[in-house]
Amino acid sequence: MEKRNIRDHKRRLLATKYELRRKLYKAFCNDPALPSDMRDKHRYKLSKLPRNSSFARVRNRCISTGRPRSVYEFFRISRIVFRGLASRGPLMGIKKSSW
């Protein structure tokens, strides 16, 4: 596994760990019914959470090459690896189309 994939995996774990807390703080920050000092307190708590605990920093990567672009989510591999595996035949149910 590449270093980038390991880093992305750690980000995914952190994001799931802090997901509920982050959503709660965001809801309190955006609630206009609360007093401004209470919203500021929750905004401060939100800023103190780890950066990598945000789902915006998670990126889908190919599990074999670590490529971040053009990754098929169902297979978790890039289009280049997918084409090679599909032509060789180890992907079940995938075959080259012809008409």
Curated annotation (Swiss-Prot):
Transmembrane segments: none
Keyword Ribosomal protein appears in the UniProt entry: yes
Gene Ontology terms: cellular component: mitochondrion; small ribosomal subunit
InterPro entries: Ribosomal_uS14, Ribosomal_uS14_CS
GO BP terms: translation
Subcellular location: Mitochondrion
Protein name: Small ribosomal subunit protein uS14m
Annotated source species: Oenothera berteroana (Bertero's evening primrose)
Phylogenetic placement of the source organism: Eukaryota, Viridiplantae, Streptophyta, Embryophyta, Tracheophyta
Gene behind this protein: RPS14
